[in-house]
Amino acid sequence: MTKKAIIPAGTSKPIAPFVPGSMADGVLYVSGTLPFDKDNNVVHVGDATAQTRHVLEAIKSVVETAGGTLDDVTFNMIMIRDWADYAKVNEVYAEYFAGEKPARYCIQCGLVKPEALIEIASIAHIG
């Protein structure tokens, strides 16, 4: 197995020992992605719609850096802080995955920073 770290330009320094993406034999694993700026501050505090868009743009950047597109994403794991944001998350999500939808699950849970309303991890098959 060949494994390669995928780190888009301008990515914030991880707050733990991990990389934004790891590619192994054509499968890209995108780490849990939070609505952080380059300095690991939460962006769009209190706005689930904007945080979801920020997270999906970051995931798109990882996938594109690996040579793929969001059409290559086959699975998403979504974690939201408040179930009341579920409809807002789905509205933005549908914009990014307009064609063939990936499998996914969504759970409500606490996240690493209290201002973060969403985290998404993804799997994509590229190539």
Swiss-Prot record:
Function of the molecule: Involved in pyrimidine catabolism. Catalyzes the deamination of 3-aminoacrylate to malonic semialdehyde, a reaction that can also occur spontaneously. RutC may facilitate the reaction and modulate the metabolic fitness, rather than catalyzing essential functions.
GO cellular component terms listed in the entry, alphabetical order: cytosol
Keywords annotated in UniProt: Hydrolase
InterPro entries the UniProt entry points to: RutC (IPR019898), RutC-like_sf (IPR035959), YjgF/YER057c/UK114 (IPR006175)
Catalytic activity, as annotated: (Z)-3-aminoacrylate + H2O + H(+) = 3-oxopropanoate + NH4(+)
Gene Ontology biological-process annotations: nitrogen utilization; uracil catabolic process
E.C. number(s) listed in UniProt: 3.5.-.-
Domain of life of the organism encoding this protein: Bacteria
Family: Belongs to the RutC family.
GO MF terms, alphabetically ordered: deaminase activity
Listed name of the protein: 3-aminoacrylate deaminase RutC
Coiled-coil boundaries: none
Species the sequence originates in: Pseudomonas syringae pv. syringae (strain B728a)
Enzyme class: hydrolase
